[in-house]
Each structure stands twice: as C-alpha cells, then as structure tokens.
Design a protein with these regions (language model features):
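N-terminal assembly/transducer modules of large multi-domain enzymes
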Residues: 145-402
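GHKL (Bergerat-fold) ATPase N-terminal catalytic module, capturing the glycine-rich phosphate-binding loop
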Residues: 1-183, 189-190
C-alpha cells in the first residue's frame, strides 16, 4: 500500500500563525523577546516615518544557515524546545516557532540580515508574505536565502536617523540580526508608537536594564531619548521592600523608609519617639530582616512551596494624596507633583524568565488587582492612626515579582 504525505494549504498555515500573533503590539513583543533569547545586550526598534519602514535590530548571536533552514523555515519548530537555555544562561522566552508569523503580522515584505562567526558569515533572507495567499501548498512556498558581503551599515542604507547608525556602529561588532519590514499593515502614528513604547517599558524588570537595553527610535530621537526606561527608575515612593525566597524557604527582606522629613529637629524627634538608634534607617539605609516563609504565608503545604520554587520581588508603596494636617503631624515629605505611574507601569506585575506575564498588573483591567488588595482594604479599613491592622490599597502599590 502506497504511503501518501499530508500537506497544508499555505494560507491555512498563515491563519494558524495569525491566531498566535493577532495583535500588532503582541507581534512586536514576541520579536523583542526573540532578541533577548539571542543573548543580545542591545535591541533597537526604529520606525522611519519618511520611508515608512520598520527596523528591528539586535546584537545577539545571529542565525547560521543550518538554523535558518532547519528551524526558522519550519513552522512550529524551534531550537528553543530542546535548548531552552541560551549560551549566556538566559531562559528562552519567545514562543516556540512562531516568531516568523510576528513578522507577517507587521508587514507584507521582510528582509533579514544576520551575521555569525565574528561577522565573517553573513546571510540575507527575504520573504513576501503575500505568496502565502495564492492557493499553493506550504511546500511550494519559498524564501530567498543568500550569502552576502553586505554589512549592517550597508543594510541600513536609506535610514533617516543617523543616531541609529551610530549606535549600530558602536554596539554591533561581530554578530547580530536586523529585520527590515516594508509595506506595513498598520498606520504607525504617534499614538501607536507611544503604546508600543509603554509596552516595552514594562516588558522586562528594571533590574535587568544593566545587561539588556531596548531602544525605540523615531526620526528625531537621540540614543538618550530613544532608550526605553522603566518608570520605576525615577519613581517617588514612601516605602520600598525587596525580598527573595531561598530554597530553604527563608525570606530575606530589605526595607527602605522614604516617607519622613524631620528637618532640623530630627534628633529631638527621634529621641522622643525612641528611634534615635535607628536614625540611619531614615537616610537610605535599608532595614534587613529574615523570616521563615510560614511566618509570612501560613497554611501553605510543603508541596505547594516546592512548586513555587525560588522567587524574588520588589514592591513600592506611595501615597496618592496628602493633607496639610497629616504632613505636619507625621513629618511627611511633601508629595506635591508626585507622578502617578499606574497607567504606564501598572500594579504588581509578574515576570517569568525575566519577561512579563500578562495581564497581571495591567492597568485598567480586572487583573490589575490580582492580589485583591482593595478587597482586603475594604474588609479592614483602619487608618494609620487607628488600632488594628492597617492595609494598603491596590492603587498605592506598584512592583514586580520574578
């Protein structure tokens, strides 16, 4: 009996990809995740409004001919399924095998220049996604792959912003990948770019900015204005707590107090309150304490704790309002002009393998207060000056767990 192979209509394969990457913002995030997976330290997203071209560049490890042919060109297949830790020890975060569909979601046409082997091996990959709509089977659709002498700077010929070129020259030395997307499917107006920039700002925790930087360039941006920062970098807060849960289920904590301004009477006030020995803690010195996990979260089984594993986080508490009476009575710092970052930074965010898990902490969604702080506050509404447990509200907290 003859064996006959299955085949798939090219358009059907394209629809499968579109179901995985249906929104533009999600497509951009997926591609940026792939740059992190490639061990990049720099990632650039640049929309050139004069030419209506979108560039995505990373200075990661690049792709060899074998990876392109046997993984990149096989829908649903990815080396990340077997090798889920990169050479630099990063857990692979991109969705396995659907990155190419993110490109399809963004534009009709795509060129990719990728370099490996110290910059000596350069490959140019070109695809027209509309060819998936002409009634052919997937095995009849092809992309062009050629060895080339083109370098990154030549590939960016026609790029309007010279600051992008300068950054590429400075940081793209021996390897990396640049995508050039044309015939874009969306209107890349200022509102869309602002939304994407906000998404990128919350994509990775601030603590990773030392090893991985994202830039979102427009035509007028410099390297300084294009760098995407987490709003937490310059966030004005009253209290900050960092914690880390170890394998032994011990919780190491550091607490910073930033609420008070005692002025010239600081020593007399602290003496009166019996806090003179703790003076340093009111001047950016953290209070260090270690707790047993069961002290903080009782009634958790050993099996549940082991499933949680090691994790850490950082929380910020910030008042949203202040009366003149409270300011004077409690020696509070003046919070006039304090920026509300909830709409951009969100609430308490979850990260897995250093990338956001949505929708937890997303502003203006039901998952913003996934810890149900508001409900706890309603059940115990005592104020600071009242007896009993005082609980914070959801709109007073931002932070990350990762």
């Amino acid at each position: 009996m003859a064996k006959i192979p299955f085949n798939v209509d090219a358009y059907t394969a394209r629809l499968i990809g579109r179901e995985n990457v249906s929104k533009l913002e999600g497509a951009v995030v997926e591609l940026v995740k792939n740059t992190y997976d490639a061990d990049a330290t720099y990632c650039i997203l640049y929309y050139d409004e004069k030419t209506d071209v979108l560039y995505l560049a990373d200075n990661g490890s690049g792709m060899t001919e074998d990876i392109i042919k046997n993984h990149w060109m096989t829908i649903g297949r990815s080396s990340k399924k077997e090798n889920f830790v990169s050479q630099k020890g990063r857990i692979q975060t991109g969705e396995k095998g659907i990155g190419r569909f993110a490109l399809d979601r963004i534009a009709d046409s795509c060129q990719m220049l990728t370099c490996t082997d110290g910059g000596h091996s350069r490959l140019l990959w070109t695809v027209d996604w509309d060819s998936f709509s002409n009634g052919k089977n997937i095995t009849e659709i092809g992309a062009d792959l050629d060895k080339t002498d083109i370098n990154f700077i030549h590939f960016l010929d026609g790029c309007t912003n010279s600051n992008v070129i300068k950054l590429i020259k400075k940081k793209w030395k021996t390897s990396g990948t640049i995508f050039k997307l044309t015939n874009l499917r969306d209107d890349w107006n200022s509102e869309l770019i602002h939304t994407i920039r906000e998404n990128l700002a919350s994509l990775i925790p601030y603590e990773l900015s030392a090893i991985y930087k994202i830039y979102c360039f427009g035509n007028e941006d410099t390297e300084e204005t294009a760098e995407v920062f987490s709003d937490l970098e310059s966030f004005s807060y009253d209290y900050k707590i960092e914690f880390e849960v170890s394998k032994q289920f011990e919780v190491d904590t550091k607490l910073w107090r930033n609420e008070y301004n005692f002025g010239r009477d600081e020593d007399s006030i602290l003496k009166k309150a019996g806090l003179i020995e703790e003076k340093e803690y009111f001047h950016n010195t953290p209070i260090n304490k270690t707790y047993k996990f069961d002290e903080i979260v009782p009634k958790v089984s050993k099996k549940e704790k082991e499933a949680l594993g090691i994790f850490k986080g950082i929380f910020y508490f910030a008042k949203k309002s202040q009366t003149k009476r409270d300011k004077e009575r409690f020696y509070q710092k003046d919070i006039t002009g304090r920026i509300d970052i909830r709409d951009t930074c969100g609430g308490i965010k979850l990260y897995r393998d250093n990338f956001r898990v949505r929708p937890y902490g997303d502003p203006k969604t039901s998952a913003y207060d996934w810890l149900q702080l508001a409900r706890r506050k309603t059940g115990s509404p005592a104020g600071v000056a009242s007896k009993g447990i005082w609980r914070v509200n959801a709109d007073q907290m931002v932070g990350s767990i990762f």
